[in-house]
C-alpha cells in the first residue's frame, strides 16, 4: 500500500484555475464515495478550501492510483486530464505524509501559521469517516496529524503573528483608505471568512457596515454582533451604490456581481471609486470588472504581498514545528511498518492457543475427575505460559518489520514456527476488509 497526495494549490495554480477544481461543501461526501470506488483507491480524504483542493489517498499501486485520481478530478469537473495535469503537484510516501503534516500545521498556507486549515482538515476527515472512505491507515495518520497540529500551535508562537486571508483583505483596505471609521463597508457572505473579515474591520474602527447573505437570518445574526446592518441580496445593487469597500466570500458557484451589474452601478456612483476584495473560490466577482474605471478589484492571489508581514518571525517558529513533524513521521512509519506483521503474530498466537486447547483436552481425558475450578486454574496458567513464551518472539517480529529486507526475514520467522504462509496471507486479507473503524478524533 502507498500514500499519495494529488494537490492543486495557490503555489502552482492561479485562482482562475483553482475555482474550476473546487468542491462545494454539499458535494464533498458524494465525491469521496465516488473516489472510493475508483480502481486502486483504498482510502481517501478530499480537502477543498479557497487556496487548495487536495486528494489524500491510500492506493495499492502508485502509477495506477495517480492515473485514476487524475481521471476522477477531470471527470468530476468535466475537464480533460491534459487540462488538469499541468497544475497538479503529486506527493508520494514520505513526501505525502510530510505534506499532510505541514498543511495541517499551517506551514504550507499562504498565511504561514494560520489555524483555519486545521479545522478544515478535521472536518474533511470526519466526513470521510462518515462515508467509510477512511480505514486503518488514514484513521491513525489523521488522528496523529490533528493532535500534532494542536500541539504545534500551543507550544510555539507561530499563530500569534499570523494573519488570516480575511485580515489581509482588511489590511489592504486600510492601506488604501487609511482610517476606516467613515467608510461604508459591504460584506457579502455570512460564513467563517466573512465573519473574520467583519471582526477585523470592526477592530480597525469600521462602524458603517452592511452584511448581505442568501439567508437573511444569518446576515442579521452576524451584523448584530458588530453593530452592523443586514440586507437581503435582492438589494445588492443599492448596497453597491453606498459602499466604499466590498469584501466578498459567499461560496456561490456563479458570479454574484457581474460586469453588467457593476457598469450600471458605476454610472450612478458619480465617479466615487469602489475598492473590492474577492476572497471567495470560486470567485464571487467577475474579474472583467477590473477593466472599469471606478472599480478596483483584488482577488485572493493579490493578497500574497500583504501576508508577507511578520513572515521572518513566523518562519523561525515554522522550523521548530518542522522538527516536531519529522519526529512524528518516524513514529507513524514505525507504526505503519508493524501493520504487515499483525497477521503473522495473529497466526502464531492462534497456533499456540490451539496447542494449549489440545493439551487441555488430553489432560481432561487422562484426569476426568477434575473440578470446574481446577480446569479453569490449569487453563489460565497454561495460557500464561504461552503468553510469556511468545512475548519475546512477538517483539522480535515487530522489530524485524521495521528493518530493511523485512519480507524475507519474516518468511524465515514463519518457517521457524511452522506457520502456513497461505494462512497468514488469508489473515492479511481479512485485516484489509476490516479497515474501516472509527477512532476518537482530537477536539480542536
From Swiss-Prot:
Q: Which gene encodes it?
A: hemA
Summarizing the function annotation, the protein's role is: Catalyzes the NADPH-dependent reduction of glutamyl-tRNA(Glu) to glutamate 1-semialdehyde (GSA).
Cited NCBIfam families: hemA
Please name the top-level EC class of this enzyme: oxidoreductase
Q: Which residue positions hold the site described Important for activity? A: 99
Residues the record lists as binding NADP(+): 189-194
Identification of the protein by name? Glutamyl-tRNA reductase
Q: What is known of its domains?
A: Possesses an unusual extended V-shaped dimeric structure with each monomer consisting of three distinct domains arranged along a curved 'spinal' alpha-helix. The N-terminal catalytic domain specifically recognizes the glutamate moiety of the substrate. The second domain is the NADPH-binding domain, and the third C-terminal domain is responsible for dimerization.
Reaction(s) catalysed by this chain, per the record, are: (S)-4-amino-5-oxopentanoate + tRNA(Glu) + NADP(+) = L-glutamyl-tRNA(Glu) + NADPH + H(+)
* Source organism of this protein record: Bacillus cereus (strain ZK / E33L)
Subunit structure and binding partners: Homodimer.
Which Gene Ontology BP terms does the record give?
A: protoporphyrinogen IX biosynthetic process
Biological or metabolic pathway of the protein: Porphyrin-containing compound metabolism; protoporphyrin-IX biosynthesis; 5-aminolevulinate from L-glutamyl-tRNA(Glu): step 1/2
Amino acid at each position: 500500500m502507498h500514500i499519495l497526495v494529488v494537490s492543486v494549490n495557490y503555489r502552482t495554480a492561479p485562482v482562475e484555475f483553482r475555482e474550476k477544481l473546487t468542491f462545494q461543501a454539499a458535494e464533498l461526501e458524494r465525491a469521496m464515495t465516488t473516489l472510493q470506488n475508483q480502481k486502486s483507491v483504498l482510502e481517501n480524504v478530499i480537502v477543498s478550501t479557497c487556496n487548495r483542493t487536495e486528494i489524500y489517498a491510500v492506493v495499492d499501486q502508485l502509477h495506477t492510483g495517480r492515473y485514476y485520481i487524475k481521471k476522477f478530478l477531470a471527470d468530476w469537473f468535466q475537464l480533460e486530464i491534459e487540462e488538469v495535469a499541468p497544475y497538479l503537484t503529486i506527493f508520494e510516501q514520505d513526501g505525502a505524509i510530510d505534506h499532510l503534516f505541514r498543511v495541517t500545521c499551517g506551514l504550507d498556507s499562504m498565511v504561514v501559521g494560520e489555524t483555519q486549515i486545521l479545522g478544515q482538515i478535521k472536518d474533511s476527515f470526519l466526513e470521510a469517516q462518515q462515508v467509510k472512505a477512511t480505514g486503518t491507515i488514514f484513521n491513525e495518520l489523521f488522528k496523529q496529524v490533528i493532535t500534532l497540529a494542536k500541539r504545534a500551535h500551543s507550544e510555539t508562537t507561530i499563530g500569534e503573528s499570523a494573519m488570516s486571508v480575511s485580515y489581509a483583505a482588511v489590511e489592504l483596505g486600510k492601506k488604501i483608505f487609511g482610517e476606516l471609521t467613515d467608510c461604508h463597508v459591504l460584506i457579502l457572505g455570512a460564513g467563517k471568512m466573512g465573519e473574520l473579515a467583519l471582526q477585523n474591520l470592526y477592530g480597525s474602527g469600521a462602524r458603517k457596515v452592511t452584511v448581505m447573505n442568501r439567508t437573511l437570518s444569518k446576515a442579521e445574526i452576524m451584523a448584530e454582533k458588530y453593530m452592523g446592518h443586514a440586507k437581503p441580496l435582492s438589494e445588492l445593487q443599492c448596497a453597491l451604490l453606498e459602499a466604499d469597500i466590498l469584501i466578498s466570500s459567499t461560496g456561490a458557484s456563479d458570479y454574484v456581481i457581474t460586469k453588467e451589474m457593476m457598469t450600471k452601478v458605476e454610472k450612478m456612483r458619480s465617479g466615487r471609486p469602489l475598492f473590492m476584495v474577492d476572497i471567495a473560490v470560486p470567485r464571487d466577482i467577475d474579474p472583467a470588472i477590473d477593466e472599469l474605471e471606478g472599480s478596483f478589484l483584488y482577488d485572493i492571489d493579490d493578497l500574497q504581498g500583504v501576508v508577507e508581514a511578520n513572515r521572518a518571525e513566523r518562519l523561525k517558529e515554522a522550523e521548530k514545528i518542522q522538527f516536531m513533524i519529522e519526529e512524528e513521521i518516524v513514529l507513524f512509519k514505525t507504526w505503519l511498518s508493524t501493520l504487515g506483521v499483525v497477521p503473522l503474530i495473529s497466526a502464531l498466537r492462534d497456533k499456540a492457543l490451539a496447542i494449549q486447547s489440545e493439551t487441555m483436552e488430553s489432560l481432561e481425558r487422562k484426569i476426568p475427575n477434575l473440578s470446574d475450578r481446577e480446569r479453569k486454574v490449569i487453563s489460565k496458567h497454561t495460557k500464561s505460559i504461552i503468553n510469556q513464551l511468545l512475548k519475546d518472539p512477538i517483539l522480535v517480529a515487530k522489530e524485524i518489520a521495521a528493518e530493511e529486507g523485512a519480507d524475507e526475514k519474516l518468511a524465515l520467522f514463519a518457517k521457524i514456527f511452522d506457520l502456513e504462509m497461505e494462512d497468514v496471507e488469508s489473515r492479511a486479507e481479512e485485516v484489509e476488509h476490516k479497515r474501516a473503524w472509527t477512532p476518537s478524533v482530537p477536539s480542536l
